[in-house]
Amino acid sequence: EAEYLKKNKIKFEIVPGVTSAIAVPAYAGIPITHRDNTSSLSIVTGHEDPYKNESSIDWSSLSKSKSIIFLMGTKNLRKNLNKLISNGMSAQTPIAAIQWGTYYKQKTVMGNLKNICSKIKENNIKSPSIIIIGDVCKYRTNLKWFEKKPLFGKKIVVTRARKNSSSLVEKIYENGGEAIEIPTIEIKSIKNKRN
């Protein structure tokens, strides 16, 4: 994105943050590195440039990884999983697909390399989503927290005057919901016209 902006002479500023490869699994209760399972992590694009002559992914090495994240991973998932399996990864390896990670409408589907594509289809998982592969996915059962927030999955319209709504909006987000601000009220002071 930055290259595109630079090429088109558009000024920009980059604000660093936590990559979705770490934040999204954390919101789903999946510790991508866990001392009992893995000390390393592989982050891979789910789809390479289609005009490349050959893949730059070393599938043989990747299939030995204990924790893999595919960013933008749903479109080519079956093809990518077949490459991992044909290079020695067990078809029973746990896998999670997370759509809309960190948002009030986050959806997580669990499975293994063999059945995840059908589960993704059944649950209508589409982009934006990421894929996590490895035994770390098993921790979700005990560590999921975001979906347990009281307003998770709720979209709430806040009609208060904008200057009075910030604390309510903040509480909605803190509790897992999404606030839509539509101020229908405006508060003004009344001027006393009596003499």
Regions found by a protein language model. Name each.
Residues 8, 64-66, 175:
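Structured helix-beta-strand junction loops
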Residues 2-3, 38-40, 44-160, 169:
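A contiguous loop/helix-start segment that scaffolds small-molecule binding in enzyme catalytic cores
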Residues 1-48:
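Short glycine-cluster motifs
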